[in-house]
Amino acid sequence: VGAAPLLFAARRLGMAKVAGVSMGVAGRGWEGFAEWLKESFPGVALFSDDGSVGTKGTALDGLPSELPADTEVWACGPQGMLRALAAKYPSDGARVRVALESRMACGMGGCLGCVIPTARGNRRVCVDGPVFTAEEVLWNEFAD
């Protein structure tokens, strides 16, 4: 999935409806992307693993400790980061949307290769997602 659909949605909504963008990258080599982000999303909180692009840290470091009312978080990234995001906002999980990545052999739900555990039973990322609320994913049962 990656960040492209989320950035597209943010641009379409306009910054009047987007409270902020927090982005994490690996480090060197992402300078061009970082410049585009700064131009496209003024005030973007940019983080990198080594501090060479933006501030040293992760995208989670750019988020508030508590979600303001009527605010949603849209996120994509490594499973560990999404798990940490769900843990950061345990009582607001319904307002945290996570775009999950999974190997999808058939892409139509038949092979069950992309199944994840949720509060509503096993769900297929390819046809039931890829976006889920953070509260519905059973992160402790999710294989790394």
List each model region and its residues.
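FNR/FR-type flavoprotein reductase catalytic core
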Residues: 1-101
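Hydrophobic alpha-helical segments
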Residues: 13-16, 34, 115, 121, ...
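A generic "cationic amphipathic patch" detector
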Residues: 34, 86, 124-127, 139
